[in-house]
């Protein structure tokens, strides 16, 4: 079985979630609500957690957000990260209000005296700080001297880290996000060679669900396959639940996340012998809320169908009005095409019950 080998980094705790070390890649997202609307923000956090998100970041943009931050933390089912830009006082307020981690941007928080206050408080509370560099908000002097490059991003990170370390703080997570996929890959590879701190990876402002998924998969897939990355956010325009779904599928495709039903199906070429598309859609819908490891193959011709179906936990190879159903590598029955969906659902439900029962026993 193919397996992605992970690079080992220092480990840090974000609340009760550990990032780095020998731990799995942690999935995170960011709310799209106004933070001062506590009810809506907490509701969205809970939705994200139900989908499989482990850490949630929320924006602290103004006094209202800062005042509401503690209420969000109190009512959240997961650790909350404060996203801070421009005003260092909001970082202090967020830490005092129970932030499990703070994200700071070297491009817009530069006052060393204020940074030392943040560092001291984070040390007392034993919470990590993410040094979050972004290609779109690099310090002006680096823009002039280096342009928007991986070297400029690395210098910005090093400045912050040097300040933090000189003040006795090493509870650090690092990110170097860029909208350009190749730039992000280069920056993260440099960081992986330079630092032993855990890396938060992402392609910033990646775009819509379609475009952003492609860009993120291209960039983050390369990094993850090379063992780089300890926590991940896929930035998409729109519903943050989509970010979590794409994260899970990307990690699953690299063998880094198994709590997912993996459905494989034909590309519906000219060899297809039955109406496959509605079957795939129905089974995807049926398994959407089932978070457990299962491989389901839905195939429609005699060329690859039987072989692929045998490799799955459950599979069908259909054609000419009937389908052969496979379970655990063996053909178990042949059923009419109009009964395929119901038969698949029954078998999947049995597997899901077995999984849930096994979890209860533990």
From Swiss-Prot:
<dbReference type="InterPro" id="IPR045854">
    <property type="entry name" value="NO2/SO3_Rdtase_4Fe4S_sf"/>
</dbReference>
<dbReference type="GO" id="GO:0141197">
    <property type="term" value="F:4-hydroxy-3-methylbut-2-enyl-diphosphate synthase activity (flavodoxin)"/>
</dbReference>
<dbReference type="InterPro" id="IPR011005">
    <property type="entry name" value="Dihydropteroate_synth-like_sf"/>
</dbReference>
<keyword id="KW-0411">Iron-sulfur</keyword>
<feature type="binding site">
    <location>
        <position position="308"/>
    </location>
    <ligand>
        <name>[4Fe-4S] cluster</name>
    </ligand>
</feature>
<feature type="binding site">
    <location>
        <position position="266"/>
    </location>
    <ligand>
        <name>[4Fe-4S] cluster</name>
    </ligand>
</feature>
<keyword id="KW-0560">Oxidoreductase</keyword>
<protein>
    <recommendedName>
        <fullName>4-hydroxy-3-methylbut-2-en-1-yl diphosphate synthase (flavodoxin)</fullName>
        <ecNumber>1.17.7.3</ecNumber>
    </recommendedName>
</protein>
<comment type="function">
    <text>Converts 2C-methyl-D-erythritol 2,4-cyclodiphosphate (ME-2,4cPP) into 1-hydroxy-2-methyl-2-(E)-butenyl 4-diphosphate.</text>
</comment>
<dbReference type="Pfam" id="PF04551">
    <property type="entry name" value="GcpE"/>
</dbReference>
<keyword id="KW-0479">Metal-binding</keyword>
<dbReference type="InterPro" id="IPR016425">
    <property type="entry name" value="IspG_bac"/>
</dbReference>
<keyword id="KW-0004">4Fe-4S</keyword>
<dbReference type="GO" id="GO:0019288">
    <property type="term" value="P:isopentenyl diphosphate biosynthetic process, methylerythritol 4-phosphate pathway"/>
</dbReference>
<keyword id="KW-0414">Isoprene biosynthesis</keyword>
<dbReference type="InterPro" id="IPR004588">
    <property type="entry name" value="IspG_bac-typ"/>
</dbReference>
<dbReference type="GO" id="GO:0005506">
    <property type="term" value="F:iron ion binding"/>
</dbReference>
<comment type="pathway">
    <text>Isoprenoid biosynthesis; isopentenyl diphosphate biosynthesis via DXP pathway; isopentenyl diphosphate from 1-deoxy-D-xylulose 5-phosphate: step 5/6.</text>
</comment>
<comment type="similarity">
    <text>Belongs to the IspG family.</text>
</comment>
<keyword id="KW-0408">Iron</keyword>
<dbReference type="GO" id="GO:0046429">
    <property type="term" value="F:4-hydroxy-3-methylbut-2-en-1-yl diphosphate synthase activity (ferredoxin)"/>
</dbReference>
<dbReference type="GO" id="GO:0016114">
    <property type="term" value="P:terpenoid biosynthetic process"/>
</dbReference>
<dbReference type="GO" id="GO:0051539">
    <property type="term" value="F:4 iron, 4 sulfur cluster binding"/>
</dbReference>
<feature type="binding site">
    <location>
        <position position="269"/>
    </location>
    <ligand>
        <name>[4Fe-4S] cluster</name>
    </ligand>
</feature>
<feature type="binding site">
    <location>
        <position position="301"/>
    </location>
    <ligand>
        <name>[4Fe-4S] cluster</name>
    </ligand>
</feature>
